[in-house]
Design a protein with these regions (language model features):
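Non-transmembrane catalytic domains and loops of membrane-associated enzymes and transporters
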Residues: 2-3, 23, 58-63
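Conserved sequence signature across two-component system core domains
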Residues: 7, 39-41, 62
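A generic structural motif
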Residues: 29-35
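A conserved acidic beta->alpha catalytic loop
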Residues: 40-48
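Conserved donor nucleotide-binding strand/loop of the catalytic core
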Residues: 34, 48-65
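Cell-envelope/extracellular polymer assembly enzymes that use nucleotide-activated donors
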Residues: 3-5, 35
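Short, well-formed alpha-helical segments that are part of the catalytic scaffolds
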Residues: 13-28
Length: 65
């Protein structure tokens, strides 16, 4: 099985993350699974909530930037 994980580092991206995620593919020819990984660098806004609302597969939360 071929899997692609798209990683997006974020810091206080509540206002822009939705548009970014909407532009990411969920299907890629020749790839069986596409997953999204958000790396939250200690955001103090609702970055993680926005990510989850857009169906992100994985969130890694770093406590500080």
């Amino acid at each position: 099985m071929r899997k692609l994980v798209i990683q997006v580092p974020c810091y206080n991206e509540e206002a822009t993350l939705g548009g970014t995620l909407s532009a990411l593919p969920r299907e890629v020819p020749g790839i069986d699974v596409v997953e999204w990984l958000i790396i939250d660098d200690g955001s103090t806004d609702k970055t993680v909530e926005v990510a989850k609302a857009h169906g992100v597969d994985h969130v890694v939360h770093l406590p500080r930037n």
